[in-house]
């Protein structure tokens, strides 16, 4: 190729040569290196490319980066290529991390019209010591075994220093100079640093278990920076000790063969000073320990306590040898061995055995008390070395028997046994504790426990019995076994309320649901039988007929009663609620209680104006113009539905205009004039505010405006509205000085009626008491008059029924008898205190009249006396009129322990013979209904002068005259005191034997059945005193058997013949 062709036109060759040279010059490049420190301030000049490259800078020269670069780190000025630190500054750790060198490289192009140049720039960022070392944690725990050898290295966490080079981490050390450790800092092949804790000497945990050290890390800056951390070194235990027995290698122990199970033989407390599993010792039997010994003895693996696990028997084996091994639980466990020799000591251990098998209930589940008791094994008596009379107490067994079980019901089976033979094996058994159970022999060595009486759980719920089994050895051994019998409950008791009636008060307007009261009932039964529930017994309340359950409710579980509605006293004042308490048994038992809920009144009603009726809350009253002062104008009537103080009304007139001309009675409501209206023109109106208030707290009021209109003329002051004229006074009438009128209501009327009834009852009681007292005085006065008179036959006595006797109250009374006194025994002198005692009070009672007497009732007076018997004297009597015969004397009959006085007329009705009906005594078979048998057989012998009898009386029988008392002459020795007064209600006792009475008695048998009316008199002797009882004729009845009847004999009077008392000399009591 020719040059021309190659280079083109010859004229273009110089231009092409210039361009080639320029390109070659531009292709030349240069590397410029700068260095700066991190953390220099933004704008710091690093270098100028134009100066460092010795370039001529013209106006068109420009420096630019070849590619985009982070201008926040470095900036290049276009004019001369000056390099400065950017606004973000330079942070070597952020730009290069832990790299040994940190270089920022970039290309800068310098071009102008003359030349083009590429400059490679490298800026090295140098490190400064702006970071201190830092430990990852403030507390660094380290563990090292006490068996670790010297030189053991334990890795530690290396502190972190973000600086590099000399400013980075240079050393880590311990602050304590004298320590069994040191810290070594090493640099690995990859440049990373590591720290190790090096053990300088052997450790012993038993002497020191831990170390507390301080780590110090330091860099190489100027000045250097450092950091600290706490290093905790815990020494781990090593199994370097073996267990040790305090007893040594061989231990001997002696054990009685009757020792109970669980007895401690030996405490093998082997100790190991190591910690944790290394010092945790486990005890086991050695391989040479026989299996039988393993069953009889128990070795606690944790505590090493050797106890008795079974019953040993000296007769079977007397020595046991046990190998016990103690081993810790550390790695490479260490062991120790001890030989234990157990020697058995012989005792008399064969006591009787007792086995109790309770009777299981039919179909009882396995978990029931019946089945549990029946499944009890035979618990034999433990061997006991005891003297005669001693025994062994056993664990008891419990049986359950229903309380309704019949007598002779089977409760349990008791079996006894004894391992001994001969007399030592013969066992006797007994049951103690209660008579409701007994033992019944069943077969050899077995007994039945049966009930001996009916049971009641509420009285005795549990019986603690004792079974005693004793053998016949010498000395005998016995076994004592407690035995408990629990009585099962049956529903045989109904719930019982604490009281039959509960009284509750509640104020009216109570909120619904308010609590009223709580009723409580108790049921002594158990379980569901004693679980009480409550309910209301339905009943109708009031006239409305509503159910009581709409008023109150009762909590079935607690018995709390709550109100279901708000009560109103004006409609319901008392609510009677019956609550029924029922148990949960079958059949169910229940009982009722009455709860009386009283509703208390509250002031809940305002007064209501009744008359005159208001119109739109106002009243108008016409007042005559000629009315003067104190003239009644009107009467206001109001009512209040409340009661008591809440219903008491008060009236007031307020705000009278134009002047106060009227006043109203505060309690009467009567309006009167207080001034003169004669000068007022007709049509003049006076206005006032009527205020009606009740007495409640707070009071309720009602107001009305009253207009008083003055009218012409003198008409009646009548309110303009319609009203009853009777409520107003006539015009011109004056007010009388009377108090407020009473307001009668039902409670007040009831109170007045009750007060009047009580007054009448009290007056009747006083009248009766006064009458009885007057009769007592009359009786005492009559007795005194009789003693003042010379005798029964003396004159001067007023006739019976005379006016003076009637006035004194001593007139004749039908079927009434005077007191008969008999000679005393003379044991008490006539001046003794007992003889001078005053007579007691006398009581009177009404008794029905006797047959043949008057139709009116008779008075049977009650007398009691404490006077001694003064002498033999007989006092007259008065018989009932109308018989047409001479009054018959009374008959005194001795019944062996007391005297009986029988009227002569009534004695005819007695019979000493059998009635023929088979109710008599021996030798009393013949009947007698004539009434003379008693007269013939009552007295066998009488002294002449006392009885008017002759010799013919022994053959023909006694006449009526024989029965008359001797009253021939006056009593020359009257007693100084009133005669003894008799009691109608005292018991008869024996009298002293009469010294004048002979010892001949007549056997008179009186019939048991008395079908007659008579008056009989009992004589009561109390310390040789006598009391005679006067009674009205008895009603037909059964009399007890009579004792021997003795008749006292008295000397005849001087006349030698019995003289009947005159009619005019009789006195009545």
Curated annotation (Swiss-Prot):
<dbReference type="GO" id="GO:0001756">
    <property type="term" value="P:somitogenesis"/>
</dbReference>
<dbReference type="GO" id="GO:0098685">
    <property type="term" value="C:Schaffer collateral - CA1 synapse"/>
</dbReference>
<dbReference type="GO" id="GO:0016331">
    <property type="term" value="P:morphogenesis of embryonic epithelium"/>
</dbReference>
<keyword id="KW-0966">Cell projection</keyword>
<dbReference type="GO" id="GO:0005509">
    <property type="term" value="F:calcium ion binding"/>
</dbReference>
<keyword id="KW-0130">Cell adhesion</keyword>
<dbReference type="GO" id="GO:0098978">
    <property type="term" value="C:glutamatergic synapse"/>
</dbReference>
<feature type="region of interest" description="Disordered">
    <location>
        <begin position="777"/>
        <end position="859"/>
    </location>
</feature>
<dbReference type="InterPro" id="IPR013164">
    <property type="entry name" value="Cadherin_N"/>
</dbReference>
<dbReference type="GO" id="GO:0007156">
    <property type="term" value="P:homophilic cell adhesion via plasma membrane adhesion molecules"/>
</dbReference>
<protein>
    <recommendedName>
        <fullName>Protocadherin-8</fullName>
    </recommendedName>
</protein>
<dbReference type="GO" id="GO:0042734">
    <property type="term" value="C:presynaptic membrane"/>
</dbReference>
<comment type="function">
    <text>Calcium-dependent cell-adhesion protein. May play a role in activity-induced synaptic reorganization underlying long term memory. Could be involved in CDH2 internalization through TAOK2/p38 MAPK pathway. In hippocampal neurons, may play a role in the down-regulation of dendritic spines, maybe through its action on CDH2 endocytosis.</text>
</comment>
<feature type="domain" description="Cadherin 5">
    <location>
        <begin position="498"/>
        <end position="609"/>
    </location>
</feature>
<dbReference type="Pfam" id="PF00028">
    <property type="entry name" value="Cadherin"/>
</dbReference>
<dbReference type="Pfam" id="PF08266">
    <property type="entry name" value="Cadherin_2"/>
</dbReference>
<keyword id="KW-0677">Repeat</keyword>
<feature type="domain" description="Cadherin 4">
    <location>
        <begin position="393"/>
        <end position="497"/>
    </location>
</feature>
<feature type="domain" description="Cadherin 2">
    <location>
        <begin position="136"/>
        <end position="245"/>
    </location>
</feature>
<feature type="transmembrane region" description="Helical">
    <location>
        <begin position="748"/>
        <end position="768"/>
    </location>
</feature>
<feature type="region of interest" description="Disordered">
    <location>
        <begin position="1031"/>
        <end position="1069"/>
    </location>
</feature>
<dbReference type="InterPro" id="IPR020894">
    <property type="entry name" value="Cadherin_CS"/>
</dbReference>
<feature type="domain" description="Cadherin 1">
    <location>
        <begin position="30"/>
        <end position="135"/>
    </location>
</feature>
<dbReference type="GO" id="GO:0007268">
    <property type="term" value="P:chemical synaptic transmission"/>
</dbReference>
<keyword id="KW-1133">Transmembrane helix</keyword>
<feature type="domain" description="Cadherin 6">
    <location>
        <begin position="615"/>
        <end position="721"/>
    </location>
</feature>
<dbReference type="GO" id="GO:0050804">
    <property type="term" value="P:modulation of chemical synaptic transmission"/>
</dbReference>
<dbReference type="GO" id="GO:0045211">
    <property type="term" value="C:postsynaptic membrane"/>
</dbReference>
<feature type="region of interest" description="Disordered">
    <location>
        <begin position="905"/>
        <end position="927"/>
    </location>
</feature>
<feature type="compositionally biased region" description="Basic and acidic residues">
    <location>
        <begin position="905"/>
        <end position="920"/>
    </location>
</feature>
<feature type="signal peptide">
    <location>
        <begin position="1"/>
        <end position="29"/>
    </location>
</feature>
<keyword id="KW-0628">Postsynaptic cell membrane</keyword>
<feature type="glycosylation site" description="N-linked (GlcNAc...) asparagine">
    <location>
        <position position="616"/>
    </location>
</feature>
<keyword id="KW-1003">Cell membrane</keyword>
<keyword id="KW-0770">Synapse</keyword>
<dbReference type="GO" id="GO:0030425">
    <property type="term" value="C:dendrite"/>
</dbReference>
<keyword id="KW-0732">Signal</keyword>
<feature type="modified residue" description="Phosphoserine">
    <location>
        <position position="1052"/>
    </location>
</feature>
<comment type="subunit">
    <text>The N-terminal extracellular domain forms homophilic interactions; these interactions activate p38 MAPK via TAOK2 and trigger endocytosis. Interacts with CDH2; this interaction may lead to CDH2 cointernalization. Interacts with CDH11. Interacts with TAOK2.</text>
</comment>
<feature type="topological domain" description="Extracellular">
    <location>
        <begin position="30"/>
        <end position="747"/>
    </location>
</feature>
<dbReference type="InterPro" id="IPR050174">
    <property type="entry name" value="Protocadherin/Cadherin-CA"/>
</dbReference>
<feature type="region of interest" description="Disordered">
    <location>
        <begin position="719"/>
        <end position="738"/>
    </location>
</feature>
């Amino acid at each position: 190729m020719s040059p021309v062709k190659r280079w083109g036109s010859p004229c273009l060759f110089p231009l092409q040569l210039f361009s080639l040279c320029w390109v070659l010059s531009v292709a030349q490049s240069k590397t410029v290196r700068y260095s700066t420190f991190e953390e220099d301030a933004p704008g710091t000049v690093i270098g100028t490319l134009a100066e460092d490259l010795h370039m001529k800078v013209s106006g068109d020269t420009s420096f630019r980066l070849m590619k985009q670069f982070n201008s926040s780190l470095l900036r290049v000025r276009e004019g001369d290529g000056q390099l400065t630190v950017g606004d973000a500054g330079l942070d070597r750790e952020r730009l290069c991390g832990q790299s040994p060198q940190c270089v920022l490289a970039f290309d800068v192009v310098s071009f102008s019209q003359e030349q083009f140049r590429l400059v490679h720039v490298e800026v090295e960022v140098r490190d400064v010591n702006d970071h201190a070392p830092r430990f990852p944690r403030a507390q660094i725990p380290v563990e090292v075994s006490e068996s670790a050898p010297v030189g053991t290295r334990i890795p530690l966490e290396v502190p972190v220093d973000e600086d590099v080079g000399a400013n980075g981490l240079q050393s880590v050390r311990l602050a304590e100079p004298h320590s069994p450790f040191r810290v070594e800092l090493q640099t690995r092949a990859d440049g990373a640093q590591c720290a190790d804790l090096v053990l300088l000497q052997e450790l012993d945990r038993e002497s020191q278990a831990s170390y507390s050290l301080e780590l110090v890390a330091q860099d190489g800056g100027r000045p250097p920076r450092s950091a600290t951390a706490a290093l905790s070194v815990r020494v781990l235990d090593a199994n370097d000790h073996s267990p040790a027995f305090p007893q040594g290698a061989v231990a001997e122990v002696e054990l009685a063969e009757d020792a109970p199970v669980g007895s401690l033989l030996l405490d093998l407390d082997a100790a190991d000073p190591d910690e944790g599993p290394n010092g945790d010792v486990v005890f086991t039997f050695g391989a040479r320990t026989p299996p039988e010994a393993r069953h009889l003895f128990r070795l606690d693996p944790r505590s090493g306590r050797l106890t008795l696990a079974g019953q040993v028997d000296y007769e079977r084996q007397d020595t046991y040898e046990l190998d016990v091994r103690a081993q810790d639980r550390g790695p490479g466990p260490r062991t120790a061995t001890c030989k234990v020799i157990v020697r058995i000591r012989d005792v008399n251990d064969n006591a009787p055995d007792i086995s109790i098998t309770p009777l299981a209930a039919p179909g009882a589940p396995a978990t029931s008390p019946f089945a549990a008791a029946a499944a009890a094994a035979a618990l034999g008596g433990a061997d006991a070395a005891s003297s005669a009379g001693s025994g062994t107490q056993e664990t008891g067994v419990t049986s359950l028997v229903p309380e309704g079980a019949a007598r002779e019901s089977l409760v349990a089976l008791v079996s006894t046994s004894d391992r001994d033979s001969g007399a030592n094996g013969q066992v006797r058994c007994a049951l103690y504790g209660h008579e409701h159970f007994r033992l019944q022999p069943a077969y050899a060595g077995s007994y039945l426990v049966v009930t001996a009486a009916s049971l009641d759980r509420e009285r005795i719920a549990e019986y603690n019995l004792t079974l005693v089994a004793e053998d016949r050895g010498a000395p005998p051994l016995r076994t004592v076994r407690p035995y408990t019998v629990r009585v099962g409950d049956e529903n045989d008791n109904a719930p019982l309320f604490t009281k039959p009636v509960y009284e509750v008060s509640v104020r009216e307007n109570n909120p619904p649901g308010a609590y009223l009261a709580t009723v409580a009932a108790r049921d002594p039964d158990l379980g569901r039988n004693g679980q009480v529930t409550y309910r209301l017994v339905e009943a109708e309340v009031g006239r409305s007929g509503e159910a009581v359950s709409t008023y109150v409710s009762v909590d079935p579980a607690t018995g709390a009663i709550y109100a279901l509605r708000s009560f109103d006293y004006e409609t319901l004042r008392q609510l009677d609620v019956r609550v029924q308490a029922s148990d949960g048994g079958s059949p169910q038992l229940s009982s009722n209680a009455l709860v009386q809920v009283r509703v208390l009144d509250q002031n809940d009603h305002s007064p209501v104006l009744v008359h005159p009726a208001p119109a739109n809350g106002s009243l108008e009253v016409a007042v005559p113009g000629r009315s003067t002062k104190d003239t009644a104008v009107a009467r206001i009537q109001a009512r209040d539905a409340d009661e008591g103080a809440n219903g008491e009304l008060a009236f007031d007139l307020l705000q009278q205009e134009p002047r106060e001309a009227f006043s109203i009675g505060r309690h009467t409501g009567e309006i009167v004039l207080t001034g003169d209206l004669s000068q007022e023109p007709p049509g003049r109106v006076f206005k006032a505010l009527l205020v009606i208030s009740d007495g409640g707290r707070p009071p309720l009021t009602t107001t009305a405006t009253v207009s008083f209109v003055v009218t012409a003329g003198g008409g009646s002051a009548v309110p303009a509205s319609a009203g009853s004229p009777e409520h107003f006074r006539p015009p011109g009438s004056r007010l009388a000085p009377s108090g407020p009128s009473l307001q009668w209501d039902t409670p007040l009327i009831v109170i007045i009626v009750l007060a009047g009834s009580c007054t009448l009852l009290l007056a009747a009681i006083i009248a009766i008491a006064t009458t009885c007292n007057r009769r007592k005085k009359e009786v005492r006065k009559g007795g005194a008059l009789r003693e003042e008179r010379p005798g029964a036959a003396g004159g001067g006595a007023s006739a019976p029924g005379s006016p003076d006797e009637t006035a004194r109250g001593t007139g004749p009374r039908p079927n009434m008898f005077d007191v008969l006194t008999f000679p005393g025994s003379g044991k008490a002198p006539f001046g003794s205190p007992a003889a001078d005692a005053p007579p007691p009070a006398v009581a009177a009672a009404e008794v029905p009249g006797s047959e043949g007497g008057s139709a009116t009732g008779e008075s049977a007076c009650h007398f009691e006396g404490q006077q001694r018997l003064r002498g033999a004297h007989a006092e007259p009597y008065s018989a009932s009129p109308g018989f047409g015969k001479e009054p018959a004397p009374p008959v005194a009959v001795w019944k062996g322990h007391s005297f009986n006085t029988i009227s002569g007329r009534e004695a005819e009705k007695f019979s000493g013979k059998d009635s023929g009906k088979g109710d008599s005594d021996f030798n009393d078979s013949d009947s007698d209904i004539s009434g003379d048998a008693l007269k013939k057989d009552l007295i066998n012998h009488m002294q002449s002068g006392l009885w008017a009898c002759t010799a013919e009386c022994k053959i023909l029988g006694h006449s009526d005259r024989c029965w008359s008392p001797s009253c021939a002459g006056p009593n020359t020795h009257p007693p100084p005191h009133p005669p003894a007064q008799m009691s109608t209600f005292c018991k008869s006792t024996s009298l002293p034997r009469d010294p004048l009475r002979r010892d001949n008695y007549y056997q008179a048998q009186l019939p048991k059945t008395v079908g007659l009316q008579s008056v009989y008199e009992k004589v009561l002797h109390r310390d040789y005193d006598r009391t005679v009882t006067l009674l009205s004729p008895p009603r037909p009845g059964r009399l007890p058997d009579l004792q021997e009847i003795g008749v006292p004999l008295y000397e005849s009077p001087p006349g030698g013949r019995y003289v009947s008392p005159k009619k005019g000399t009789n006195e009545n009591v």
